[in-house]
Amino acid sequence: VLLNHADIMTIHSFCLSVARENYNRLGIDPAFRVADETETLLIKAEILDRLFEEKYGSDEPEDFFYLVENYSDGTSDVKLRELVLKIFEFMRSYPNPEGWIEKQKLSYKDGEDYWFDMMKKYLLFYIEGAVELTKTTVETAEISGPETYLPMLYDDLEQLEDIYGSASFEEICLKIKNIKFSALSRKKCESETKEKVKYLRDRVKKIISSVNTKFLMRNTDEMKEDIKKAGFGICRLLDLVKEFSDMFDEEKKRRRIADYGDLEHYCLKALIDGSYDNPVKSQAAEELTSKYAYVMTDEYQDSNAVQELILSLVSGERNRFMVGDVKQSIYSFRLANPDIFAEKYNTYSLKKGAEKERIDTFLS
């Protein structure tokens, strides 16, 4: 009996319903229709043509020509057009697309500090792995031999652990480049674990070699220049994406249509008071929260960040159920984010009755 009163629908049907009920708050035409994928693709192509034509005919086309030269293949601007569309679709999978653009631009305005901090984390991640593997190697040699290898292994560990004490990215790079793996002792020894120890040490050496090849082929001054050049192009590319987005929105408004991405963002806007960083439930969200005893989501692995925030805004305390299998995520082309599912899978408890409970045998 209760099932007959349930709202069973796709996420976009739900978003459409919320948008229509809150059209006045959203400032949209209540008579808008949802465009199909073919119509949407044609409009995007039309807007891109118009935007690029304006840029080619601009009095100051230098920045645009820079993008064409650096993000196309030299024969046409097709690659740049494709890139604009990819970034546009990607940013719409976030609750605040414009905020996402500004965040990316700010990361380049901050220059090398932002990127060096990020690279520092990557380097220390690899070094942590090398340290743990070296500790295992040392323990193996201490217990089962060969003892003649221990001075070299202790030296390996000392060099690797010393990197943790480095304050700056530049210092970390220098210490990694200067790591020296002394030759193992050639003294004859009887040890069943001799080959295992050599194998483990070789794995450590490969980690360091990989770090040098992937991250440290250029010195820090060259990296700073690379970041500066990349920032120049990326910021102008993002400006171009923003222009396309604004023109696309205006054209859809003129035609009184919306696409599926619009439905998600209309719905989210109706459910939020305050900022996207610290969302507060709107009156509409509170009413929906009171309406639904349970909020159940199937194929949860195919959710994106916008959908996740929408569902959280209409859920109450301990009334949300999510079903999915991260291995079956097939909608990456629609910018689903399986990490949302994976994060909950890895943090929810298997303990029955836990506040956030994971049930692995749901289907059985």
Segments from the language model and where they lie:
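Conserved ATP-dependent motor core of P-loop NTPases, especially the RecA-like helicase ATPase domain
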Residues: 1-167, 171, 258
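Short mixed-charge
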Residues: 1-2, 350-358
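Conserved helicase NTPase motor core
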Residues: 7-11, 16, 32-41, 45, ...
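A short hydrophobic/aromatic micro-motif that marks alpha-helical segments and, especially, helix-coil
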Residues: 27, 161, 208-209, 274, ...
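Coupling/switch/interface segments within P-loop NTPase motor domains and analogous charged loops
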Residues: 57-89, 96, 151-245
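Oxyanion-binding/catalytic loops of NTP- or PPi-dependent enzymes
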Residues: 320, 349-350
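Acidic/histidine-rich catalytic neighborhood
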Residues: 346
